[in-house]
Amino acid sequence: MELNKTLSLLGACLMAFSACNTSHNSSDDNFNDTVASALAGGGNIALDQMQWTREPMAYSISGDSLSITTAAHTDLWQRTYYHFRNDNAPVFQMQTDEQYFSFVVKTDFSQSHRRFDQCGVVMYLDSDNWLKASVEYENEEFQHLGSVVTNNGYSDWATTAIPADVKTMWYRFSRRADDYCIECSRDGSNFSQMRICHIPAAAGRISFGVYACSPEESSFTALFTDFSISECMWKAHDGQQPDEE
């Protein structure tokens, strides 16, 4: 009797494992590598291939244009200095296994008006591992052009002040394996480095795209256009040689 019970339980476990494994394989079979598709198609990104990690209060997609209307008290930040853990900003992303590529997008934040209103590029893996780059409104005199990298649940923030009358910004997000570079541009042609970083959790399949949020009592509409993918524009280092192991 006991042997029969044991065999029955073992059979049930094997069936459950098989079902889970089938489901996992099915998910992999349905995976659409947006970067690979874009590279094969001349660099154009079909926005209908991107997905919401979290939806905003309102949004609109028209051709290659996306608008996001933020809700108040939405943000991305983990622990450092402020001690709070904010993890509710709307994020619109694509997935890829590609190890070398660049992603470019133009942002328009002419409607931002309250402190920390922001929009930009993002690579959001989970609550504790992500990066973002954006312009954050401060006041009528200046804004913060900056980037945040979050590893293992702790965020940092690197910024520089820019005039408040800047209302558009291009970003270029580049990947070389698990190293990343973020650049910005006022004209979409001449890019300046903002950040080089390493994210251990981002060595395999990643999700990346755009985001917008309003951490304080505010709401605004951000516009994203000119989405494109290309071969990696962040070239391999050709200066000082690595130290010998």
Predicted regions and their residues:
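Bacterial N-terminal signal peptides that target proteins for export
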Residues: 1-8
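Hydrophobic helical h-region of N-terminal Sec-dependent signal peptides
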Residues: 11-15
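C-terminal motif of bacterial Sec signal peptides marking the signal peptidase cleavage site
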Residues: 17-19
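Extracellular glycan-recognition regions
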Residues: 24-245
